[in-house]
Amino acid sequence: MDNKTFEEIVVLWQADKKQYVKRSTYSAYSLLIANHLLPAFAGVNDVTEILVQDFVFTKLQQGLSQKSIKDILIVLKMILRYGVKQGYLEHREIDVKFPTERERQEVEVLSRNNQKRIMEYVQSHFTFMNLGIYICLCAGLRIGEV
């Protein structure tokens, strides 16, 4: 077996995957890898269930949603499967558990009065940044969509 670090396997996986997925999908994978997977597993030779479980708890503590973490884990498992298939890693089952949600986070929404005040301010103090804020308010965009 040709042992490689997680980072080396990622580079090979990306080169292989690029041929088969759309550019937007490849970009999404690359973003998840750069922002989450490489900082956590870059120098690791053996990605274990314990490491992945710790990674999940860390991401939850940082405020990522379970859905976002599950999306990251899908990419991680694709990379690990590729590593096994190519003979760089031994097959290993990784069963990650998520804690039950005890309390729902309250979504903060602007009141009509506050929205009106912001829109009046933006209209009287024009800048291109304020124009962007105005458009977002009028279109109903959420913070994560901006």
Predicted features, each with a name:
Residues 70, 85, 89-91, 95-143:
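Basic, Lys/Arg- and aromatic-enriched nucleic-acid-binding interface segment
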